[in-house]
Amino acid sequence: MVVGLLGGSFDPPHPGHVHITREALKRFGLDRVWWLVSPGNPLKPRPPAPLARRLAEARRLMRHPRVAVTGLEAEIGTRFTAETLAVLQRRYPGVRFVWLMGADNLAQFHRWERWRAIMESVPVGVLARPGAGLRARTSPAARRYASALLPEAEAARLGRSAAPAWCFVNLPMMDLSSTEIRATGRWRGQAD
């Protein structure tokens, strides 16, 4: 089984997350996708909304028979993606994991804790995001792992590829971001 992992704050979850999840299922040869709704993001200056609220909203929004919305990082007590991947690989030895991220995250991936360990442990599927394509393709991570890049036409092989392997796919984009939704007050302004 090949499982894509889409981690993030999901603060709030929105239709753009659903869109890239459906695209990842189609493009990367995945059997399932697990959303890893994180307790917090070490790279963000302020804490997210309560985890229970984000999980409930994510489960309301993401309804697909091949997608599970989880709070695994809180359950297993990990803070960084590399730690989470190590635990999941030990816990599920028969599962092939693929890390999923938007191009905006690839652009700053080199700031993540043990980012090279992530690239070396699982294939990485990168999905285009508005305004982030060039920054992502020229990022330190993209340059460091240029030889491991699969052509977009071979994206379906990603789930069966040995790490390091990554693939950047273009897709119809939705110009939505959690940051912009929070800025409008539509998320934080709601009762917890």
From Swiss-Prot:
Highest taxon in the source lineage: Bacteria
Pathway assignment: Cofactor biosynthesis; NAD(+) biosynthesis; deamido-NAD(+) from nicotinate D-ribonucleotide: step 1/1
GO molecular function, one term: nicotinate-nucleotide adenylyltransferase activity
The keyword Transmembrane belongs to this UniProt entry's keyword annotation: no
Pfam families noted in UniProt: CTP_transf_like (PF01467)
Catalytic activity: nicotinate beta-D-ribonucleotide + ATP + H(+) = deamido-NAD(+) + diphosphate
Known EC number: 2.7.7.18
CDD domains, A to Z: NMNAT (cd02165)
Enzyme class (EC, first level): transferase
GO BP: any one term: NAD biosynthetic process
Keyword set, alphabetical order: ATP-binding, NAD, Nucleotide-binding, Nucleotidyltransferase, Pyridine nucleotide biosynthesis, Transferase
Function noted in UniProt: Catalyzes the reversible adenylation of nicotinate mononucleotide (NaMN) to nicotinic acid adenine dinucleotide (NaAD).
Family: Belongs to the NadD family.
PANTHER family given in the database record: NICOTINATE-NUCLEOTIDE ADENYLYLTRANSFERASE-RELATED, PHOSPHOPANTETHEINE ADENYLYLTRANSFERASE
Protein name: Probable nicotinate-nucleotide adenylyltransferase
Species of the source: Cereibacter sphaeroides (strain ATCC 17029 / ATH 2.4.9) (Rhodobacter sphaeroides)
